[in-house]
A protein has these predicted regions:
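Alpha-helix N-cap and loop-to-helix initiation/capping positions
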Residues: 20-24, 50, 54, 89-97, ...
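Short, acidic/polar
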Residues: 19-32, 93-109, 130, 153-157
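N-terminal binding-site loop/beta-alpha segment at the start of enzyme catalytic domains
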Residues: 1-70
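A short, structured active-site edge motif that brings together acidic residues
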Residues: 67-80
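Surface-exposed, active-site-proximal loop segments in enzymatic domains
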Residues: 79-92
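Beta/alpha (TIM)-barrel catalytic core signal, keyed to glycine-rich beta->alpha loops juxtaposed to Asp/Glu
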Residues: 122-287
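Active-site groove signature of glycoside hydrolases
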Residues: 106-125
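Acidic (Asp/Glu)-rich catalytic clusters
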Residues: 2, 58-70, 106-110, 139, ...
Length: 287
C-alpha cells in the first residue's frame, strides 16, 4: 500500500479537539488532497466513537472521489464513553468485535472498504491465530485492503508476521521519543518491509520546557536558517531521513500547517546535521 508522505491524523477533528463542522471537515479533506495529503488516519474510538461519522459526512459533501484517498482505521480499544457505557477500559480482539468494528467504520466513513486496518494496541490476551483468521476473512471479503498494527514491539510484530503480512506499524517516534530507533523496532521493520508511521512526530518539543528541548531548540535555530524552513519542518525532516521511511502522522487541522508539513518531506538534512540534532536530543555524543 502506498501512502502520502505525510498522513493526516483525525483524532482532534471532532469533539476530542477542534470540534469541526461538517463543512470544515469537507474543506479540510479537499485542501489536504490538493496539497498531496491523500491518506487519513482514524480509529473507531476517536471522539468517543463519533469522529469517523463526522469525517464520513464531510467526505460525502466534498468533491473528492473515494478512490483518490486512502483511509486507515484502528480497532481493539474499548473506551468508556457515552456510546460505550463500560466501566473499565480494555482491549477486545475477538472475532465478533473485529468484524463489528470494521463494519461500523465502513458505515461511518461512508465507504465500502478500508485501505488499511490496524490493531490499536497489543493486548496480553490477544490470540494470534484467531485474529489472523479473522483478518484474512476481511481481506478475502475485500472490506480491507491491508492489515497493520500500532504500538507493537519487534517480538509482537514477529508473532503476527509469521501468520499474516503486516503492512505498517504506527509507533510513537520523534526527536524527543527515540526508543524505536534504539530498541530494535525500526531495525526490525526495515528488515521486513513494514512501513513505520509516527504518531506525535513533533514529540514534546512544543509541550515542555526542559534541558533536552532547550538543546534541541538551539540546533533548530541554527538549521532552520541553513535550510530556510521552520522548526517543525526540521523536526519532521529529521524523522523522514531515517532509512526505514518513517511517515509522520500529523494532527493539525490548519491547512497552512499541513502544507508546511508536506514541504518538510523535500528537505534533505546532511548526514552530519542529522547527527548533530540527535546529539542535542540525547545530550551526548554518539557512542
Amino acid at each position: 500500500m502506498n501512502y502520502s508522505k505525510i498522513i493526516s491524523g483525525t483524532m482532534n477533528w471532532g469533539i476530542w479537539g477542534n470540534n469541526l463542522s461538517t463543512k470544515q471537515v469537507s474543506e479540510l479533506i479537499e485542501n489536504s488532497v490538493e496539497f498531496g495529503v491523500d491518506t487519513f488516519d482514524h480509529a473507531d474510538i476517536y471522539g468517543g466513537y463519533t469522529t469517523e461519522e463526522l469525517f464520513g459526512k464531510g467526505l460525502i459533501e466534498s468533491k473528492i472521489d473515494r478512490e483518490k484517498i486512502k483511509l486507515i482505521s484502528k480497532f481493539g480499544i474499548m473506551y468508556p464513553s457515552d456510546k460505550l457505557p463500560i466501566k473499565v477500559k480494555h482491549y477486545d480482539y475477538s472475532k465478533d468485535h473485529i468484524i463489528k468494528s470494521v463494519e461500523n467504520s465502513l458505515i461511518n466513513l461512508k465507504t465500502d472498504y478500508l485501505d488499511c486496518v490496524l490493531m490499536h494496541r497489543p493486548s496480553p490476551l490477544m490470540d494470534i491465530n484467531k485474529i489472523s483468521d479473522t483478518v484474512n476473512q476481511l481481506l478475502e471479503s475485500e472490506k480491507i485492503k491491508s492489515f497493520g498494527v500500532s504500538n507493537f514491539n519487534p517480538q509482537q510484530m514477529q508473532m503476527f508476521n509469521n501468520k499474516i503480512k503486516i503492512d505498517c506499524n504506527q509507533i510513537q517516534c520523534s526527536l524527543t521519543h527515540l526508543d524505536p530507533i534504539y530498541d530494535g523496532t525500526l531495525d526490525y521493520m526495515q528488515s521486513k518491509g513494514i512501513k513505520p508511521m509516527a504518531w506525535k512526530p513533533l514529540g514534546e518539543f512544543y509541550l515542555k520546557k526542559n534541558d533536552q528541548n532547550n538543546r534541541i531548540r538551539e540546533k533548530l535555530l541554527k538549521f532552520k536558517k541553513k535550510y530556510n524552513c521552520s522548526e517543525s519542518q526540521i523536526l519532521l525532516s529529521w524523522l523522514i531521513k531515517h532509512p526505514s521511511n518513517i511517515i509522520p502522522v500529523v494532527g493539525t487541522t490548519k491547512i497552512d500547517r499541513l502544507k508546511e508539513s508536506i514541504d518538510s518531506s523535500s528537505i534533505n538534512l546532511e548526514l552530519i546535521d542529522w547527527f548533530e540534532i540527535l546529539e542535542a536530543s540525547v545530550g551526548k555524543r554518539a557512542p
